[in-house]
Amino acid sequence: MRFSIFFKVVALFMITLFSFGAFAYYFVSSQISHENYQNEMRHYQFVTTINEILNNYSDYRAIEDYLYKIGFRETTIENLEKVLAKRRHQLHHRNIGYAEVFKFSDMVFILLKKDEHFVLYKDLHSVSYRNYFLAITVGLLLILFLFLFVLQSLLPLRELRSQVKPFAQGDKSVSCKSKQKDEIGDLANEFDNCILKINAMNESRVLFLRSIMHELRTPITKGKILSSMLKEELSCKRFSSIFDHLNMLIEQFARIEQLASKNYGSNKEKFLMSDLIDKIEKMLLIDEDKESPIHVSSSNYIIEADFELFSIALKNMVDNAIKYSDDKQVFLDFIGNNLVVSNKSKPLKEDFEKYLQPYFKSSNPSQAHGFGLGMYIIKNALEAMGLNLSYHYSNGRICFTIHDCVFNSFYDLEEDNEELPPPPPKI
């Protein structure tokens, strides 16, 4: 379970607040109990002293002076009559003076029997717990201030997060500039600088690619115009085919660039395998008059993918399979919903994941060649369409499997009376 940093800060604040409250309650309770015990012992000491004076000297003047010094004053409280009634009855049976201490409504009194009447003295010293509660209040305010201070310091993280998400989704107009003078502010400003640099690099890259494509298309267009003026029909067709192929390569280059920069929008559709093979043969400039090195178990299967992107991926797979096979042949078979591309060759010497890296070179001198950008393009193209690629070696063949790309077969569609999708435009 994942928790945000704000949740953790709030949870920490609540735990701190609860711990402080428990500690404050325990501390104040123990202090109050201790002070009450000390006051009780002090008052009983007063009464003991007064009773000794009465027993030995019966000097009421000295007792009054003593009570005055320790902070007791004579008082009369009418609402204490019922409380004192029982004590008066007990004190009437004593022949000599007697003093007793008691509490009433959080006030301390000393009841003194003086001859045949009673005098009530009240303790003017009041017990105050204001300092304890003041300390608790200051502690709570300090914890609250620290919590708000930390929370305010972390708020730019939420704003930075809200800016990072649109930037990751392709919005290059976000700004993360911060005036905060701490680590979070530095992080936001560095990220803002990074956005500016990335935008500048993207603009430079787009300008560079557009310039190259423009400079390449201009001579290609001129070449096509000049080739159309040739009188010999065969030469005219050959030159026209060459320029068409160059133009197609430029378009492929643009799609590959979009794919590498994660700016390509995949558009899945259904198309026949035969149409896909026709386009791949034209992309590889395979002569129609000669036997094709591409062997398909059946051309009646229907593929569900982005036609242009899938053709680029499969073209690179077929090209590598022909180039590195022992017999310069490649085989396309269908197993369930998977398309298997295989050729006769020795198994890969390195881990398959290494071949997916751009310009990978084998460490084995006997296999010093690599696949260039081919496998890298294949991997990214298939991932853009949500397809997976796997490798295995079986019966003397290297087999690459594209999973879950086969929709159905043409015959199955005819049995289900489904309408066949129109073929994609041919080049």
From Swiss-Prot:
Q: Which residues form the Histidine kinase domain?
A: 211-398
Q: What's the PTM story here?
A: Autophosphorylated.
Q: Which InterPro entries match?
A: ArsS-like, Bact_Sensor_His_Kinase, HAMP_dom, HATPase_C_sf, His_kinase_dom, HisK_dim/P_dom, HisK_dim/P_sf
Record membrane topology: Multi-pass membrane protein
Give compartment(s): Membrane
Phosphohistidine modification, residue list: H214
Name the keywords, alphabetized.
Kinase, Membrane, Phosphoprotein, Transferase, Transmembrane, Transmembrane helix
Query: What Gene Ontology cellular component terms go with this record?
Result: membrane
Q: Which reaction does it catalyse?
A: ATP + protein L-histidine = ADP + protein N-phospho-L-histidine
Q: Which domain of life is it from?
A: Bacteria
Which Gene3D superfamilies does UniProt cross-reference here? Answer: 1.10.287.130, 6.10.340.10, Histidine kinase-like ATPase, C-terminal domain
At the top of the EC hierarchy, this enzyme's class is: transferase
According to the UniProt record, which cysteines are disulfide-bonded? none
Give the stretches traversing the membrane.
Answer: 3-23, 131-151
Q: Which SUPFAM superfamilies does the entry mention?
A: ATPase domain of HSP90 chaperone/DNA topoisomerase II/histidine kinase, HAMP domain-like, Homodimeric domain of signal transducing histidine kinase
**HAMP domain location:** 151-203
E.C. code: 2.7.13.3
Q: Name one GO molecular function term.
A: phosphorelay sensor kinase activity
Q: Name one Pfam family in it.
A: HATPase_c
What does the record say about the knockout?
Deletion leads to a decreased urease activity to one-third of the level of the wild type. Displays also an exacerbated stress response that results in enhanced and accelerated biofilm formation.
Q: What does this protein do?
A: Member of the two-component regulatory system ArsS/ArsR that regulates genes involved in biofilm formation and acid adaptation by acting on major ammonia-producing pathways. Functions as a sensor protein kinase which is autophosphorylated at a histidine residue and transfers its phosphate group to the conserved aspartic acid residue in the regulatory domain of ArsR. In turn, ArsR binds to the upstream promoter regions of target genes including ureA, amiE and amiF to positively regulate their expression in response to acidic pH.
Q: What PANTHER family does its record include?
A: SENSOR HISTIDINE KINASE ARSS, SENSOR HISTIDINE KINASE CPXA
Identify this protein by name: Sensor histidine kinase ArsS
**The organism of origin for this protein:** Helicobacter pylori (strain ATCC 700392 / 26695) (Campylobacter pylori)
